[in-house]
Amino acid sequence: MINKPIVIPSPNKKRKAVLNYLGKIQSGREYYSLALDEIPLSLQSRIFGHVCLWSSDSRFLSVQEWKENDEVAGPKSYLLLIFDLFTRRECIVAEVEGAKSEINPQGFIGESLMYTVIYDGQFGITKNFESNFQHLAGWQTLK
């Protein structure tokens, strides 16, 4: 079975994020490569989940990156990343342990990114968070 790329256009239709299917872990979660129009090289050899969320002005894109993926157990950790396509930078918003949780962007409100962390386990807790991402330390230039 050939999986077609998932194209996620920006709200202004001037940019697009493209997820290309790479595989599936034992739990059924799928993982992808990510391509962005204007950033061809810096995302190579990185693995992403299926969630991409654009800001309403099409400047920011938030994604879930998988770190140290194991095809059976899944990723060692999930990163919630944000890309600033105007300044061509990226920043880690949050990180959670992959075997016990998952992290997903939910929405942009003003200068904040709302996101959810789902903690697996016996009681399965879900927590919502807010990050004023533009003031985070650790922004790095995309190559």
Language-model features and meaning:
Residues 36-41:
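Short strand-turn-strand beta-turns centered on an Asx-Gly dipeptide
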Residues 33, 51, 60-62, 79-84, ...:
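Ordered hydrophobic segments in well-structured contexts
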Residues 25-33, 69-82, 121-135:
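Structural motif
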Residues 42-47, 94-97:
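Surface loop/turn motifs at the tips and blade-to-blade linkers of beta-strand repeat domains
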Residues 52-57, 63-77, 87, 99-104, ...:
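Acidic, low-complexity, intrinsically disordered interaction modules
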Residues 1-11, 83-143:
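Acidic, small-residue rich beta-repeat scaffolds with periodic aromatic anchors
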Residues 11-26, 58-71, 108-120:
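Short beta-strand elements that form the blades of beta-propeller/WD-repeat-like
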